[in-house]
């Protein structure tokens, strides 16, 4: 099945090189923050450049496993809460959020992790974890200190790197370790780099790997933080999609278990997008060290990032209900149970600890070529792993793997899996 694949597209596989444009005369230049010029193209932008001349097989309906956007229906209780609070349009919201929302968040943290946090000082509502993860770096990074560094897992959620660069810091990367379920190997960061580090982003469960960080690694990070004074930002937005009986450990939970009930130099970010299938709601929270959150609230007060009252009301309803979360998790479990064994026949793939991604190795190790030919011949879109990582310690840890987001309904995910199996059986690496 070769429809849409031609030599011209084949040449594209050689890799798209993104070169900065030649500098225009100053009078023609648009005034801007020069740090914007340090940003890398987003993975989907790079993939669009790779596929711009490609014609997917028109005989097959397109299926996308590329974007991690939940496709399960939004819970009715959230929709009802939004509609019931439209009067909130007529008031300015407080940046710190309404007390009832902070209390609902603390109630969820108590039920989920057994944590007792102060709703007045240890939690802040945010407009989804993405904006908060970015904005937090702008709050805690002191770019005037020589060599300001932000440590990130590799591969990684691209916001971490962008946040570091626009805060005036340099990102440093800890590659994933295939021998440890693709968890980030923090031991790859040397002492000199740790000494310059001001912030580390932890992603647990990981994107794209699904790996959950165990308690012992939290202990090691806390010891490093105490020694060097850096802040830990734990991105936990996939925490409610897991496949075994034991729920993923939170950084906050780990801190309490290790005798750090004040969450010193630690904050955790959680979102309703994946937990409750409401990515358009843009709602989440950050919790942890009260002193850090006081500074973050000051930043957010000027940044104009208050959550609107209707979204706050809907968020209260979401955090107070667990039935829809259990049903959502069961739907993902059913999909992964059906799809993973199929793909394991032809790809290097296994059930992750958590998240809604499969992190699959491809025959021959060329993730770009595999992605393009799969799209051209079978009209299935996936994301090349090399676009989610950076070259570090001489390797790109995403190369040779693809990320598959099993976000659509089970039947569509199964159809995509069958096409991938058929394609891979005929694929010549």
Language model: regions and residue ranges:
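N-terminal small-domain helix-loop-helix segment of the aminotransferase-like
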Residues: 27-131, 135, 318-319, 427-429
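Helix C-cap/helix->beta junction micro-motif
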Residues: 54, 58, 167, 227-228, ...
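Conserved core of the PLP fold type I
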Residues: 89-223, 240-241, 246-260, 413
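A short helix->loop->beta-strand "cap" motif at the edges of active sites that frequently abuts
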Residues: 148, 227-230, 263-264
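Conserved core segment of the aminotransferase class I/II
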Residues: 253-333, 337-342, 424
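PLP-dependent enzyme catalytic core of the Aspartate aminotransferase-like
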Residues: 261, 373-382, 389-429
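Conserved glycine-rich beta-strand-loop-beta hairpin in the small C-terminal domain of fold type I
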Residues: 312, 316, 332-340, 349-362, ...
